[in-house]
């Protein structure tokens, strides 16, 4: 992000490995980098329960300048007012946001469960509203099909080649580490 070389990236961390905490500490680090000129960090989730969970997680560590978008209008207002903070929102709050809200390049979007939300209208509206933003997808189950492809949405390098993952911690790695117990059926 500091160098501005890659505008997208995909992080595959298996379920239960701490994606929310990784997002939290990533947001914290990005907010403190002077080179980013006080960026806006947008945390995007796809379910109301995840919205509440991640808001609670961020609140527990008292990440400064963190707020939750409570409505479509609330999110639109926060973005239009050039708020330099961490904003937590569901993807659905981008419904009917066809206008450009922020032109700045120091807007960084961390998308939880990226494999589920980036093929539809709301994702297109989010990208249209924030055309110069950085988009980083977090997933435990990337999809690699012709009609839905997490790698295509987040793994393209400036030269058009696909960079599969910025970081990879899959189920095999979790089992090897002892963080996940394998299940055997008889």
Question: What is the role of each PLM region?
Answer:
Residues 1-186:
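RecA-like P-loop NTPase motor core of helicase/translocase proteins
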């Amino acid at each position: 992000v500091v160098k501005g070389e890659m505008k997208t990236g995909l992080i595959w961390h298996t379920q239960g490995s701490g994606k929310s905490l990784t997002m939290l500490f990533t947001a914290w680090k990005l907010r403190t980098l002077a080179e980013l000129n006080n960026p806006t960090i947008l945390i995007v989730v796809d379910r109301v329960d995840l919205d509440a969970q991640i808001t609670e997680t961020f609140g527990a560590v008292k990440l400064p300048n963190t707020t939750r978008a409570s409505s479509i209008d609330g999110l639109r207002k926060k973005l239009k007012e050039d708020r330099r903070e961490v904003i937590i929102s569901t993807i659905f709050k981008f419904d009917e946001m066809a206008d450009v809200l922020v032109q700045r390049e120091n807007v960084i979007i961390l998308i939880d469960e990226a494999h589920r939300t980036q093929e539809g209208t709301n994702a297109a509206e989010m990208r249209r509203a924030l055309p110069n933003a950085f988009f980083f997808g977090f997933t435990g189950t990337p999809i690699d099909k012709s009609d839905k492809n997490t790698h295509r949405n987040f793994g393209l390098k400036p030269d058009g080649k696909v960079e599969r993952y910025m970081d990879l911690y899959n189920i095999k790695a979790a089992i090897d580490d002892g963080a996940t117990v394998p299940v055997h059926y008889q």
